[in-house]
């Protein structure tokens, strides 16, 4: 936001110097980026009129001008500006004037004497325009000091605003903060109604609901099309970074800069029928003021007459209804639009305007009626005309309502760590335009409509801290006892999980928590998804329901770049929609791994082989061993897994994850031409650590017995081993599966499982009779429970 220092001081009388004002603005959160002094060395620059201009006899691009500078005689000035002409009023630097580093002297240019210099705005340091002489109004008093005529000296101040301070996109909004910081008051502002003279109106229809709940319009007829922007108004615009265009456009820009309310002026004679605020129809076209023809979708707000859109609401007017140098009848517009309805629409069209910048951050919903009265008064004063009544259409139920906030003394002290006197609290908040009612605990505060960023008690306390001064808050060290957090023995921390996986030659990767909906469809993961309201892009619009889609995609990108052995893992949050409508999504921490390529790094002593299910299961079991988790595996029916090489993972009877080979069809769809083995499971159940319980080491020898059973194909090793453990009890030290065989000698529908039982007692040496009894019991149970038979 750029503005004139003198303009600001006209709204808030303060004694601070320019440097003090800049320091104050920065201290209260309105960071000053640049201060450009204007007109401080124009003591010998006057208003002058060119009486005669003749071509220089020795130079085609120079003119010899006779100039009236109010000194009783004409001065001869040699000038090279393309717009130098008889009758032009422009600044003249007299001999002895200092313009920047240049001192003006009498000189000869190509043999012709020149007694001064006609100046451009850039040469005077007033503007960046160097196209020609600074053209002043024809009625500017010849001979008057230019600084006096232009209201100089002044300064152009540019501040950097945070997104929450949209109220400071106006001179008056800034004035309230300055008044509070400098113990001053903002000058009262007269926005009284202008009485209508005619009855001419345009009906207004609001058809966009909450997106456009307030719209004010006024017809003014009989405007003088030859009226020019007065120098005081043009200079305020120029010093605020806005180039004057024409009177009507300049008035709307002036109101926007002074009050913060964007406005638009239509040529009334180009409008047909009532004005409507509505959503655009897909495919509608509109020629904009910048000359572009745009095709709209149904997400834009438009201002339309009876037959067509005539403006993009909150962004830019239409070319066909613009005001021109012949406009005599005008329709002024001032409206409030919901920021969400404007946000992002300009970027769709590659369009950035001052109006859009303000509307998408928020504009005071109470301003439109005031702004249209101020603009009307300026039009009548500068261009004449006959005003009609203001048409004020609104949907009160959709207008923002100010909240009453309880501000407690104790809360101020607790948040800021200092006590602020009640008198100072009241003074600062009232200077900011807030209404206060004293209560026992403090005050009930209602913020003005322009401060829509004030919603909770802490917002008010932040304002007090800004205005009171952060530099006045004493520096204190935090107190309290320092405690060393002891790691829980019942919990395996994430760092340990990472170290375990790294020790298994896995490398950690971190992927986006957002995924492409199309990718999830390929994985057939479409239930319970959490979509983003404002995604970074269409490809990152869903919060990930699990880690594997992103992890496998990363593995695929690496495999496609000649990485022969890829071993990745990731720890991260996953998200699921809540079962109850309106409840917050659920999130949980998962761990996943995905590998492909060779099982081992290339070495001369081992034959190369590809990684398989059992390799990755070994990685998972090593991780489980770190927490003492006893995992069980059951065949899985997940659609993204290979039907014969995947399993669901259970702990204590609860499914906590999945392990297996990614389905070949899915891998092909992802452009991965190698087998991918992966697992993913919930981290919470996995890291619940079983505390070690030290037992007595047996002094007696262990005994091993090997058994082989023919069991039906559908019977899993997990079920068989569970039966063995239950049957043998405390004598069993370990049961190991050391062979699985299908083929010759084994009937179809069966498989051979060979296991080793390791038995040991702590109190005695087991005899053959003891061991034989155990083996007999094991054989009987397995044959009975699993329809198995001992293999001979």
Swiss-Prot record:
Cofactor: how bound: Binds 2 magnesium ions per tetramer.
Sites where the protein binds Mg(2+): 453, 459, 462-463
Compartments where located: Cytoplasm
Organism: Xanthomonas oryzae pv. oryzae (strain MAFF 311018)
Domain annotation tRNA-binding: ranges: 39-147
Subcellular location, principal: cytoplasm
Residue ranges of every copy of the B5 domain listed in the record: 400-475
GO CC list: phenylalanine-tRNA ligase complex
EC number: 6.1.1.20
Taxonomic classification: Bacteria, Pseudomonadati, Pseudomonadota, Gammaproteobacteria, Lysobacterales
The protein's name in its UniProt record: Phenylalanine--tRNA ligase beta subunit
Molecular function GO labels: ATP binding; magnesium ion binding; phenylalanine-tRNA ligase activity; tRNA binding
GO biological process: phenylalanyl-tRNA aminoacylation
Reactions catalysed, as given in the entry: tRNA(Phe) + L-phenylalanine + ATP = L-phenylalanyl-tRNA(Phe) + AMP + diphosphate + H(+)
Keywords for the protein's UniProt record, in alphabetical order: Aminoacyl-tRNA synthetase, ATP-binding, Cytoplasm, Ligase, Magnesium, Metal-binding, Nucleotide-binding, Protein biosynthesis, RNA-binding, tRNA-binding
Similarity section: Belongs to the phenylalanyl-tRNA synthetase beta subunit family. Type 1 subfamily.
Enzyme type, top EC level: ligase
One Pfam family here: B3_4
């Amino acid at each position: 936001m750029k503005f004139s220092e003198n303009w600001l001081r006209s709204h808030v009388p303060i004694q601070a110097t320019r440097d003090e004002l800049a320091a104050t603005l920065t201290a209260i959160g309105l960071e000053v980026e640049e201060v450009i002094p204007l007109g401080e060395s124009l003591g010998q620059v006057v208003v002058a009129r060119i009486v005669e201009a003749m071509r220089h006899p020795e130079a085609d691009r120079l003119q010899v001008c006779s100039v009236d500078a109010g000194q009783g005689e004409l001065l001869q000035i040699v000038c090279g500006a393309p717009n130098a002409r008889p009758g032009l009023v422009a600044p003249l630097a007299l001999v002895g004037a200092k313009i920047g580093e240049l001192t003006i002297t009498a000189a000869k240019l190509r043999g012709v004497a020149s007694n001064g210099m006609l100046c451009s705005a850039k040469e005077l340091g007033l503007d960046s325009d160097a196209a020609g002489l600074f053209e002043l109004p024809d009625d500017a008093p010849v001979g008057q000091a230019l600084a006096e005529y232009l209201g100089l000296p002044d300064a152009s101040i540019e501040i950097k605003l945070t997104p929450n301070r949209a109220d400071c996109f106006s001179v008056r909004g800034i004035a309230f903060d300055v008044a509070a910081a400098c113990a001053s008051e903002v000058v009262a502002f007269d926005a009284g109604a202008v009485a209508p003279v005619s009855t001419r109106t345009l009906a207004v229809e609001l058809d966009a609901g909450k997106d456009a709940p307030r719209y004010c319009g006024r017809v003014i007829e009989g405007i003088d099309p030859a009226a020019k922007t007065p120098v005081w108004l043009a200079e305020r615009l120029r010093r605020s970074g806005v180039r004057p265009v024409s009177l009507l456009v300049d008035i709307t820009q002036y109101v926007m800069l002074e009050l913060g309310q964007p406005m638009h002026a239509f040529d009334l004679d180009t409008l047909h029928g009532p004005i409507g605020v509505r959503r655009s129809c897909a495919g509608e076209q509109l020629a904009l003021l910048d000359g572009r023809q745009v095709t709209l979708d149904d997400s834009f707000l438009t201002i339309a007459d009876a037959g067509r859109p005539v403006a993009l609401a909150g962004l830019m007017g239409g070319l066909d209804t613009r005001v021109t140098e012949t406009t005599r009848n005008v329709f002024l517009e001032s409206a409030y639009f919901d920021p969400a309805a404007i946000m992002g629409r300009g970027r769709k069209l590659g369009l950035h305007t001052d109006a859009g910048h303000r509307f998408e951050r928020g504009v005071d919903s109470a301003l439109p009626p005031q702004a249209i009265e101020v603009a009307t008064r300026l039009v009548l004063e500068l261009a004449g005309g006959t005003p009609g009544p203001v048409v004020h259409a609104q949907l009160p139920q959709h207008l923002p309502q100010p909240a009453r906030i309880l501000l407690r003394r104790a809360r101020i002290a607790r948040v800021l760590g200092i006590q602020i006197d009640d008198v100072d609290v009241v003074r600062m908040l009232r200077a900011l335009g807030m209404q206060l009612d004293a209560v026992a605990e403090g005050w009930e505060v209602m913020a003005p409509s322009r401060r829509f960023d004030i919603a909770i008690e802490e917002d008010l306390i932040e304002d007090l801290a800004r205005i009171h001064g952060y530099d006045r808050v004493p520096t204190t060290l935090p107190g309290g006892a320092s405690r060393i957090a002891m790691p829980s023995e019942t919990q395996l921390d994430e760092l340990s999980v990472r170290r375990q996986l790294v020790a298994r030659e896995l490398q950690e990767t971190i992927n986006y928590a957002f995924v492409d909906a199309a990718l999830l469809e390929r994985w057939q993961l479409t239930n319970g998804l959490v979509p983003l309201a404002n995604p970074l892009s269409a490809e990152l619009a869903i919060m990930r329901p699990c880690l594997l889609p992103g992890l496998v995609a990363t593995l695929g990108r690496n495999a496609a770049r000649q990485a022969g052995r890829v071993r990745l893992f990731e720890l991260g949050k996953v998200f699921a929609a809540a079962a109850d409508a309106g409840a917050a999504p659920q999130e949980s921490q998962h761990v996943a791994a995905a590998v492909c390529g060779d099982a081992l790094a290339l070495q001369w002593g081992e034959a190369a082989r590809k990684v398989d299910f059992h390799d990755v299961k070994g990685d998972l079991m090593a991780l489980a061993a770190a927490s003492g988790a006893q995992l069980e595996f059951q065949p899985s029916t997940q659609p993204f897994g290979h039907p014969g090489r995947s399993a669901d993972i259970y702990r204590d009877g609860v499914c906590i994850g999945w392990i297996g080979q990614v389905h070949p069809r899915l891998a092909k769809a992802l452009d991965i031409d190698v087998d991918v083995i992966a697992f993913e499971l919930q981290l919470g159940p996995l890291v619940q650590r079983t505390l070690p319980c030290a037992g007595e080491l047996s002094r007696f020898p262990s005994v091993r017995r090997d058994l082989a059973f023919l069991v039906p194909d559908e019977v899993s090793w997990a079920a068989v081993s569970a039966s063995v453990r239950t049957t043998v009890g405390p004598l069993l030290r370990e049961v190991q599966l050391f062979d699985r065989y299908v083929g010759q000698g084994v009937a179809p529908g069966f498989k051979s499982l060979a296991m080793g039982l390791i038995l040991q007692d702590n109190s005695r040496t087991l005899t053959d009779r003891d061991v034989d009894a155990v083996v007999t019991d094991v054989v009987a149970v397995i044959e009975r429970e699993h329809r198995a038979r001992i293999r001979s």
